């Protein structure tokens, strides 16, 4: 569980105070965990920084999800000041003054937003593809779809459609859980 908290927390921009709280450790321990994580998995910090820089460099402060939807970062805060409220640019300029340098707020969350938006794109595309294949998903929760199926072979056909919904270099895999209800379903 702790490894999941650390890995997802780092990917999604969790700070040391939040990490300390989640792991029930002191802040110094959380700082050491963060340091060790980034030394062992350096590409995560590079990816986070790259996505954050991409947002900062765009005039409209946006990035696009896998299917092209815009993820906007349109709030601003004073550069170098902690705990100042992020505001739309005109309001930030009025609140903090014309001479105070501003930066885009929350860009540390850009990788999280990109991942979540792209996962939503994939799920939505799978729903469209299933509909076009004559299937009717009954329920969607995050990245899961609930369908009524006749048997395992029918479930496997649905899985094939879902796995092909978005072409990626790394194959997209789908799990199948079967049962009389969502709560009683077991992985097959």
Task: Locate each region found by the language model.
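Conserved catalytic core of nucleotide polymerization and phosphodiester-bond processing enzymes
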Residues: 1-188
């Amino acid at each position: 569980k702790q490894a999941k908290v650390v890995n997802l927390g780092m990917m999604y921009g969790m700070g040391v105070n939040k990490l300390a709280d989640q792991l029930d450790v002191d802040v110094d321990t959380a700082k050491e965990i963060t340091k060790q994580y980034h030394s062992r998995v350096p590409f995560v910090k590079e990816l986070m920084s790259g996505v954050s820089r991409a947002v900062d460099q765009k005039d409209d402060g946006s990035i696009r999800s896998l299917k092209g939807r815009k993820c906007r970062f349109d709030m601003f805060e004073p550069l170098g000041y902690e705990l100042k409220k992020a505001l739309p640019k005109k309001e930030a300029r009025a609140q903090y003054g014309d001479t105070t340098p501003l930066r885009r707020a929350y860009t540390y969350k850009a990788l999280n937003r990109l991942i979540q938006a792209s996962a939503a794109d994939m799920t939505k595309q799978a729903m469209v593809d299933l509909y076009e294949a004559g299937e009717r998903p009954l329920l969607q929760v995050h990245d899961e779809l609930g369908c009524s199926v006749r048997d395992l072979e029918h479930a496997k056909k649905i899985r094939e459609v879902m796995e092909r919904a978005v072409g990626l270099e790394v194959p997209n895999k789908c799990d199948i859980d079967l049962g009389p209800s969502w709560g009683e379903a077991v992985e097959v």
